[in-house]
Amino acid sequence: MAIFEINNSFLICAVSIALNPLLWNIAARSEYNHKTLTKLANGDSKKACYMLAACIFVAGIVRDLIYQNALKQQPTLGIFMNPLVQGIAKLIFCFGSVLVLSSMYKLGLVGTYLGDYFGFLLPERVSGFPFNVNDNPMYNGSTLCFLSTALRYGKVAGLLLTLEVFFVYRIALKFEEPFTAKIYAARDSKQAKKSE
């Protein structure tokens, strides 16, 4: 018996995992370079940011539901169903959730959902928990939640999809981190010129 199957629900899930960060990065770059979303929101950049936040949030929930549905259609590996693995899965989920929720709290709604691409820049780099223990707590916490769900359901396919989540987020960071640094460097340069 196979330990996982590449079926339609698995493939749909793999596509949804890849599309989430791709689409929000395309939308955010378009906003930064052309004010596309602000134009759609009648010139209100805060409203545009909230609209993107809602889209990202809903897309994340849809992706998570697709993931759970895909796992339900996969074979279960019995070794994952023992109490030790299930306990570890619960701990991983709790830690991942703490990373995600505490980073959302620290960043606020606008900071969490790409507000810097809309011109809403934080006064300084966020420090303190969870950013003092992890550079990317949202992405790493989310990845841990995927991992815990795979273990909880006892699905090897979930582990493979979790690996995809990990690599998709790493690729997204290759684009996001330098671009965000560029946005803040431009702001700092502008402020330095004003103070001269």
From Swiss-Prot:
Transmembrane segments: 41-62, 90-110, 154-174
Record's GO cellular component terms: endoplasmic reticulum; endoplasmic reticulum membrane; mitochondrial membrane; mitochondrial outer membrane
Residue ranges within the lipid bilayer that do not cross it: 2-28
Membrane-topology annotation of the record: Multi-pass membrane protein
Classification via PROSITE patterns: SAM_PEMT_PEM2 (PS51599)
InterPro entries referenced in this protein's UniProt entry, alphabetically: PEMT/MFAP, Phopholipid_MeTrfase
Keywords associated with the record: Endoplasmic reticulum, Lipid biosynthesis, Lipid metabolism, Membrane, Methyltransferase, Mitochondrion, Phospholipid biosynthesis, Phospholipid metabolism, S-adenosyl-L-methionine, Transferase, Transmembrane, Transmembrane helix
Cytoplasmic side of membrane: 63-89, 175-196
One Pfam family hit: PEMT
One GO term (biological process): methylation
Binding site for S-adenosyl-L-methionine: C94, F95, G96, E176, E177
GO molecular function ontology, one term from the record: phosphatidyl-N-methylethanolamine N-methyltransferase activity
EC number in record: 2.1.1.71
PANTHER family xrefs: PHOSPHATIDYLETHANOLAMINE N-METHYLTRANSFERASE
Family statement drawn from the similarity comment of this UniProt entry: Belongs to the class VI-like SAM-binding methyltransferase superfamily. PEMT/PEM2 methyltransferase family.
Function: Catalyzes the second two steps of the methylation pathway of phosphatidylcholine biosynthesis, the SAM-dependent methylation of phosphatidylmonomethylethanolamine (PMME) to phosphatidyldimethylethanolamine (PDME) and of PDME to phosphatidylcholine (PC).
Protein name: Phosphatidyl-N-methylethanolamine N-methyltransferase
Gene: cho1
